[in-house]
Amino acid sequence: MVPRLLLRAWPRGPAVGPGAPSRPLSAGSGPGQYLQRSIVPTMHYQDSLPRLPIPKLEDTIRRYLSAQKPLLNDGQFRKTEQFCKSFENGIGKELHEQLVALDKQNKHTSYISGPWFDMYLSARDSVVLNFNPFMAFNPDPKSEYNDQLTRATNMTVSAIRFLKTLRAGLLEPEVFHLNPAKSDTITFKRLIRFVPSSLSWYGAYLVNAYPLDMSQYFRLFNSTRLPKPSRDELFTDDKARHLLVLRKGNFYIFDVLDQDGNIVSPSEIQAHLKYILSDSSPAPEFPLAYLTSENRDIWAELRQKLMSSGNEESLRKVDSAVFCLCLDDFPIKDLVHLSHNMLHGDGTNRWFDKSFNLIIAKDGSTAVHFEHSWGDGVAVLRFFNEVFKDSTQTPAVTPQSQPATTDSTVTVQKLNFELTDALKTGITAAKEKFDATMKTLTIDCVQFQRGGKEFLKKQKLSPDAVAQLAFQMAFLRQYGQTVATYESCSTAAFKHGRTETIRPASVYTKRCSEAFVREPSRHSAGELQQMMVECSKYHGQLTKEAAMGQGFDRHLFALRHLAAAKGIILPELYLDPAYGQINHNVLSTSTLSSPAVNLGGFAPVVSDGFGVGYAVHDNWIGCNVSSYPGRNAREFLQCVEKALEDMFDALEGKSIKS
């Protein structure tokens, strides 16, 4: 299984595909066609983005050994050191030189982009649980707008406005502002738009603003991951103008853009959705959507059968739809139900291969569930934030709006699929596998109310470091050991950057965790505070390095990928059990915070692991954890709470309760 990459969210940012038009597609700029009109073209910075650096080999080896230190005993560590030495002076050196040479020949991209696509698209495991994460929206602040039809209409219109704004080049470029008072201003934007694209990044850099890569954005819409034998393909058809809607496992399509590229009137979209919500067709006996949850080779074979049974046109409609809107017929009970429903549901009402599914339950609870190969959390989060803001601040319809009087029976097409016996058998097998797997997944969440970002920053501590330290203490308390831990960090500051790994388990967190968990009475509050400060400093350094492309994980991954591509026998470093162990990420963590996000989550990446989605808010800390039967998520969260209580006690000068 592969490390999950949600992201470490850089605040707001955007991206568009090759040859994307830089100005409106049509004269259709009537009211409500765009959600913003940026004076700086969306892709203005893309050409001048800096390239993702390949770290020096000696730096990578040094960082790798530092990350291994807390996970190994002395004997194991010495062995790993030997493997590293011979790698650095031998085959590793050769591979590194070849990687650097290859990178010089491919200046249009990054050294990680190709191998990363390969890794995702060649993986044969189901995309459900193994790769696809979800992010759930907060409710609309105006409660009557959470009516399912109203919210579905508003979310759909806002999503299409985003699509139009992006393609017209009118979406604000995604920029990380270190000094927004200087760079996030109309004056600066008026100036920078006249700087040629080949130089624009430097102009932003001078005012401490970092434009982010937007190359992933064009795959947000009209895109699907197609199952193929041994390696899947990403398919995009940006000419298609229809939306795919799933309800009760039935498939419907209707156009949301007209022939001139204008958005179909919101009242018509509302009428079509109302028609679909009131359709009394029963759920199909063999729900096709289960197939998207299958092993990729099995699904590839079944898809071929589906095509040759006369379903080619219907599948093309599914694959090319702007996105997939899933309307669920039940309300959400609580946060745990929300997580299960948005992460996997019952398998009948999602097309898991779509670049994203927008899921809306009966009570208006809404989430984005996305396929991960095409893009990372940064692109999805920008879309997410803009859609939330637009749909709540300038909604297209109100709860009182009357749907248009239009004949939806003509406009809305229900897709029917011809199923052979082999396909029916395939769907039944997929359902059985799906149901059995989902039964094994536990999800639980906690909200720690004693404090958050504000308090921790006053204590001069990194809020993220404290959250990560809590996970280390919790695992130590629960299982008595320190294990491989993964935190995703975006490298979108670079052209075609993806993610880098932060390794939160360090000698500092191990020492600090042992002090808090095993012998708190032996240390004064001051000593415990000092250890926390050391952890925070080191975590801050690791985070900065990762964001700057100076981690070790992607570099070692790319060298391994290169060796495999060249048919070179796998170097010993990669056969070392310690390498296997550090990449068996028992704690897989990812943080997301945004005023639009209620919570996010994903499954563990290994069978004996935890999937930890978390957010440190101003005055509270939220944590959403998943596990399989080998681990206890509820108990882990109790240990996380205990760790946070202990740390807050120490910071307030109190003694730790045993």
Swiss-Prot record:
Its EC number is 2.3.1.21. It catalyses: (R)-carnitine + hexadecanoyl-CoA = O-hexadecanoyl-(R)-carnitine + CoA; octanoyl-CoA + (R)-carnitine = O-octanoyl-(R)-carnitine + CoA; decanoyl-CoA + (R)-carnitine = O-decanoyl-(R)-carnitine + CoA; dodecanoyl-CoA + (R)-carnitine = O-dodecanoyl-R-carnitine + CoA. Changing residue 628 to S: In CPT2DI; hepatocardiomuscular form. The active site is at residue 372. One of its GO terms (cellular component) is mitochondrion. Inhibited by trans-2-hexadecanoyl-CoA. Pfam families: Carn_acyltransf (PF00755). Pathway: Lipid metabolism; fatty acid beta-oxidation. Residues 1-25 form a transit peptide. The modification N6-acetyllysine is found at residues 79, 239, 305, 510, 544. It is found in: Mitochondrion inner membrane. It is linked to Carnitine palmitoyltransferase 2 deficiency, myopathic, stress-induced: An autosomal recessive disorder of mitochondrial long-chain fatty acid oxidation, characterized by recurrent myoglobinuria, episodes of muscle pain, stiffness, and rhabdomyolysis. These symptoms are exacerbated by prolonged exercise, fasting, cold, or viral infection. CPT2DM affects most frequently children or young adults, and severity of attacks is highly variable. Myoglobinuria can cause kidney failure and death. PANTHER family: CARNITINE O-ACYLTRANSFERASE, CARNITINE O-PALMITOYLTRANSFERASE 2, MITOCHONDRIAL. This is Carnitine O-palmitoyltransferase 2, mitochondrial. It comes from Homo sapiens.
